[in-house]
Amino acid sequence: MKRSRTISMIGAVCTFGLAVATSAVNAADDNQLSVTVAFGRGLNTQGTPVNNVVIPDTIKLKENGVVNFIVAGFHQIVVYNPGKTDDEVVVPGTGTFIDDTNNQFYSGIVPAGGPGALPITTDPSNARNRVESVSFPGPGTYLVICNVRNHFNGGMFAYVQVH
């Protein structure tokens, strides 16, 4: 009798410990100060729609946290302030870039050249295959898009939820 009670207690303690550890991991997922995000699937893909993704497409972050976007290929990160949604982005009918600056929070490196449309100064250029870190100082849901028109039209956008 005493032995079965001891085994039951050990089982209960183990179950409780596992439940606490699991909830701590889930809570940590929503409360990260630094998150790494793939902005493009990778250099081992062709320059096709397969590469034009943001993984994951919902990013959860603590206030004042940082998202490190690992950019693979010809992409430009643009982040909008909370409140703007993907269906509110003004997309021109032609051209390479969208350039909708309304309610814009951050505009990343232009992949066709250096910052601010400067010509490429090195080969290989730092405008492709890079890491861009973006800080999110306030709460809200931020829209992140690829500013390349065809990429955005193909669904290359994500949301950063800051708590």
Report residues per predicted region.
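Serine/threonine-biased, Pro/acidic-interspersed low-complexity stretches characteristic
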Residues: 3-4, 21-28
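Bacterial N-terminal signal peptides that target proteins for export
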Residues: 2-11
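Extracytoplasmic copper-binding redox domains, predominantly the cupredoxin/blue-copper superfamily
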Residues: 25-163
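Bacterial N-terminal signal peptides
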Residues: 11-19
